Amino acid sequence: MSEMSLIMLAAGNSTRFNTKVKKQFLRLGNDPLWLYATKNLSSFYPFKKIVVTSSNITYMKKFTKNYEFIEGGDTRAESLKKALELIDSEFVMVSDVARVLVSKNLFDRLIENLDKADCITPALKVADTTLFDNEALQREKIKLIQTPQISKTKLLKKALDQNLEFTDDSTAIAAMGGKIWFVEGEENARKLTFKEDLKKLDLPTPSFEIFTGNGFDVHEFGENRPLLLAGVQIHPTMGLKAHSDGDVLAHSLTDAILGAAGLGDIGELYPDTDMKFKNANSMELLKQAYDKVREIGFELINIDICVMAQSPKLKDFKQAMQSNIAHTLDLDEFRINVKATTTEKLGFIGRKEGMAVLSSVNLKYFDWTRL
């Protein structure tokens, strides 16, 4: 059995997919798509090493200790070149994680022809009439190239060292005069590029798990600036001490959302040692944090918030706070509840030295079946 490693390309921006979630993080059952696709291929062969390119290494490492991860580049070729630095096996298989349902039959066809050329690649024939600039092309000469592809590692590295932009391995190797061998591709190996493609693939649907997160934050009164809660001005001068604008509710809610998704906390994302967050709009930071959560495949179910303050009274502001949260997070207002309570004059809150907020949220996997 030939020594071979596997590279899975999962660092793309999913621009053409055109949803809030990056396609590599769509959930298939409980697995993100990148993991589902990698598990599928790794079940067919005892790869020497499996390398996954990523734009979110810390989060992806939570799913497995069996793979190596490397930060992707700005292009496919750059990502592949970086991943190849970790590969020393004679052969390397490269695939896009967006080709989720590669079959064992296709995999075996690639392996069986390993000694035929420098790069073995699956390809589909074109059945439909094909036009270019309104001129009919000879469809018999057209091939739709797919992945996974198997290449001789040294030759692929050399091909990419040309620093030219190639969209797949076979064209890079062919540009150097290398020999390409085509095997029959398959419809199931078509790339998931547009959200409409989901309807063409028989994929497991997301599981119905719910993820709960809590966030707690405290700030001291003392700044002669507006007191903001959920971006709503509560008092013109009773501001809270903070590196940002001091919106303690926004901070608590941000932590709750990050926690439910497993993305750390607000201090990691927006450190108070970074001057670019000085006096920052905390509701805008909340929105950015939720955008990151949505990118990795989650969406909010509901929010419940308890504001603890002896003063000022908040009854007349709760509706405005709920509305502003709904607008910021693109969430139905009926899914948001803001409560206010005192501590009956006990403790630092009762002494009017500061205020605290406890936020709880529930997340679920993004339901891509609605697309």
Swiss-Prot record:
Residues flagged as site, Positions MEP for the nucleophilic attack: 139, 191
InterPro entries: IspD, IspD/F, IspD/TarI, ISPD_synthase_CS, MECDP_synthase, MECDP_synthase_CS, MECDP_synthase_sf, Nucleotide-diphossugar_trans
Keyword Transferase: yes
This protein's record includes keyword Transmembrane helix: no
GO biological process terms, semicolon-separated: isopentenyl diphosphate biosynthetic process, methylerythritol 4-phosphate pathway; terpenoid biosynthetic process
Cofactor dependency: a divalent metal cation
E.C. number(s) listed in UniProt: 2.7.7.60, 4.6.1.12
Pfam families (alphabetical): IspD (PF01128), YgbB (PF02542)
Top-level taxon in the UniProt lineage: Bacteria
Membrane-spanning ranges: none
Sites where the protein binds 4-CDP-2-C-methyl-D-erythritol 2-phosphate: 217-219, 243-244, 265-267, 270-274, 309-315, 341-344, 348, 351
Pathways per UniProt: Isoprenoid biosynthesis; isopentenyl diphosphate biosynthesis via DXP pathway; isopentenyl diphosphate from 1-deoxy-D-xylulose 5-phosphate: step 2/6; Isoprenoid biosynthesis; isopentenyl diphosphate biosynthesis via DXP pathway; isopentenyl diphosphate from 1-deoxy-D-xylulose 5-phosphate: step 4/6
Region annotated 2-C-methyl-D-erythritol 2,4-cyclodiphosphate synthase, chain positions: 211-371
Signal peptide: none
Record's catalysed reaction(s): 2-C-methyl-D-erythritol 4-phosphate + CTP + H(+) = 4-CDP-2-C-methyl-D-erythritol + diphosphate; 4-CDP-2-C-methyl-D-erythritol 2-phosphate = 2-C-methyl-D-erythritol 2,4-cyclic diphosphate + CMP
NCBIfam families: ispD, ispF, PRK09382.1
Family: In the N-terminal section; belongs to the IspD/TarI cytidylyltransferase family. IspD subfamily.
HAMAP family: IspDF, IspF
PANTHER family reported for this sequence: 2-C-METHYL-D-ERYTHRITOL 2,4-CYCLODIPHOSPHATE SYNTHASE, CHLOROPLASTIC
Protein name: Bifunctional enzyme IspD/IspF
Organism: Campylobacter jejuni subsp. jejuni serotype O:2 (strain ATCC 700819 / NCTC 11168)
Taxonomic path: Bacteria, Pseudomonadati, Campylobacterota, Epsilonproteobacteria, Campylobacterales
